[in-house]
From Swiss-Prot:
Positions with a binding annotation for GTP: 454-461
Catalyses which reaction(s): N-terminal L-cysteinyl-[protein] + hexadecanoyl-CoA = N-terminal N-hexadecanoyl-L-cysteinyl-[protein] + CoA + H(+); N-terminal L-cysteinyl-[protein]-C-terminal glycyl cholesterol ester + hexadecanoyl-CoA = N-terminal N-hexadecanoyl-L-cysteinyl-[protein]-C-terminal glycyl cholesterol ester + CoA + H(+)
Annotated organism of origin: Mus musculus
UniProt entry tagged with the keyword Lipoprotein: yes
Lineage: Eukaryota, Metazoa, Chordata, Craniata, Vertebrata
EC number per UniProt: 2.3.1.-
Protein name, entry field: Protein-cysteine N-palmitoyltransferase HHAT
Length: 499
């Protein structure tokens, strides 16, 4: 570990960089407010003393609008129904929750939405009866592909009066795909039996349990992902809470959610980062300080946004006696590609490891097997997210980042290199080398994820301005700040996280 004074200095430099760069984004937002208002129609809002709001983050506005319209009330309804079922007829709670989920789906998506979810789930269930993992995967991928067929999209659009209703159906079917895929693959792992078995394991893979899993409403529209074995086990043996403990969970959970929501709203009122990213001329002309602030603001807003979007279902799951996947870890404590994938969306990571990476061999089949397993995993993530050009580029870059990190780690762990480093470097120097490598990794991690958040053009702009036109001073300054940033992150991980 570093001396206390050095770690404190790194912490102060990191905080100073955050605040200074955020202030630069705030200044640019104010200077170009009129121009951005004309182009993107900033929203008038009384929440923060009349500050205008950047409305260009589609995902945040979409879910907030649906939340205010119906979803909040349907979530409250689920909480009431689930708690009453636990008190009155605990044995039948899964089926009651399933029926409520179907009714809630009908309330927001109508009969066509319920039929589509049932149709996809039933097809996957029927194919899984062949006990073939390959067939089940092909079925899931084909069902997922139907969501992008133009002729099918036109039919689904005619079912609804607004685009938002259509998009809600698309998002719901996309997330449900992972759920019925998990169920199907678990069913494929069960040996076919000549006679029906009354055992819990046999009953768990029945059609009613598939519907209970798929229509569990807290995670119905947007996740997070909970693999079927965990869902079944926890629904069978939930951690029942006393009334006092449940009220405490609600109070703490709502308090956190309100703080996260308030912080997210404050960010889009003070910093028009999404509008600035959508304006190529402004992005090319702002200072490097502002560019750095925009990058940090984008990734931190994405983190806070998902604290809210995953925090609501996580709260309801805890009240149901289930253990939700951990919420995303703060991106300001990430210093590696591996850590980002492991700790941001834990539910999705668990799904990918269990059903894609390990079945393909993972690290058990040598270097080539690892590369192919990792590449296939990232390819599936890109395809599931929508299969756009930006997503394929982002997935390829992240695969490259994970591969290079893994290669460097293996090199440093070879006996020759490890002994050489131990002989010539003190523990403090070893820590500094770790931070230096982490700074390089973090710079690429931020750059590659900006491709996901802003598109390929935004990524090119950052690459050109920071690493090509900005060489050497801007590039080295960024790496210097990230070096300090990495020291703090590594110390935090060693103190609070079991790696």
């Amino acid at each position: 570990m570093l001396p206390g004074w050095e770690l404190t200095l790194c912490l102060l430099v990191s905080l100073g960089f955050h605040f200074r760069s955020f202030y630069e984004v705030y200044k640019v937002s104010r200077e170009h407010e009129e121009e951005l208002d004309q182009e993107f129609e900033l929203e008038m809002d009384t929440l923060f003393g009349g500050l205008k709001k950047d409305p260009t983050d589609f995902e945040w506005n979409f879910w907030m609008e649906w939340g205010k319209r119906r979803l909040v009330w349907l979530f409250i309804g689920h909480m009431a129904v689930s708690q009453l079922a636990t008190l009155l007829t605990k044995k039948h709670r899964p089926w009651i929750v399933m029926v409520y989920g179907m009714w809630a789906c009908w309330c927001v998506l109508g009969a066509p939405g319920v039929v589509m979810v049932l149709l996809h789930s039933t097809i996957a269930f029927c194919v899984a009866q062949f006990r073939s993992v390959l067939l089940s995967w092909l079925c899931s991928l084909l069902l997922l592909s139907t969501l992008r067929l133009q002729s099918v999209e036109e039919v689904k659009r005619r079912w609804y009066k607004t685009e938002n209703e259509y998009y809600l159906l698309q998002f719901t079917l996309t997330v449900r795909c992972l759920y019925y895929t998990s169920f199907s693959l678990e069913l494929c792992r069960q040996p076919p039996s000549a006679q029906p078995t009354p055992s819990a394991q046999g009953a768990s893979h029945s059609y009613p349990w598939l519907l209970t899993y798929v229509f569990y409403y807290p995670v119905f529209h947007n996740g997070p992902i909970l693999n079927f074995p965990e869902f079944f086990r926890q629904m069978q043996q939930p951690e029942l809470n006393s009334l006092q403990h449940s009220l405490c969970i609600v109070a703490k959970g709502l308090g956190r959610l309100l703080c996260w929501w308030w912080l997210a709203e404050l960010m889009v009122h003070l910093m028009y980062m999404h509008a600035l990213y959508s304006s190529a001329p402004l992005l090319e002309s702002v200072s490097c300080w502002t560019l750095g602030g925009l990058a940090l603001a984008q990734v931190l807003f994405f983190y806070v946004k998902y604290l809210v979007l995953f925090g609501v279902p996580a709260l309801l799951m805890r009240l149901d006696g289930l253990t939700p996947p951990p919420l995303p870890r703060c991106v300001s404590t990430m210093f590696s590609f591996t850590g980002m994938w492991r700790y941001f969306d834990v539910g999705l990571h668990n799904f990918l490891i269990r059903y894609v990476y390990i079945p393909l061999g993972g690290s058990q089949h040598g270097l080539l097997g690892t590369l192919l397993s990792t590449a296939t995993t990232f390819a599936f993530v890109s395809y599931w997210h929508g299969s756009y050009e930006d997503l394929w580029c982002w997935a390829a870059l992240n695969w490259l980042g994970v591969t290079v990190e893994s290669g460097v780690r293996r090199l440093l762990e070879t006996p020759c290199v490890r002994e050489t480093l131990a002989r010539h470097l003190s523990p403090q120097a070893h820590h500094r080398l770790h931070a230096l490598l982490a700074a390089c990794s973090t710079s690429m991690l931020i750059l590659f994820n900006l491709v996901f958040l802003g598109g390929i053009q935004v990524g090119k702009t950052y690459w050109n301005r920071i690493f090509l036109q900005g060489w050497p001073w801007v590039t080295l300054s960024v790496l210097g700040f990230l070096y300090c940033y990495s020291h703090v992150d590594i110390a935090w991980a060693q103190t609070y996280t079991v790696l």
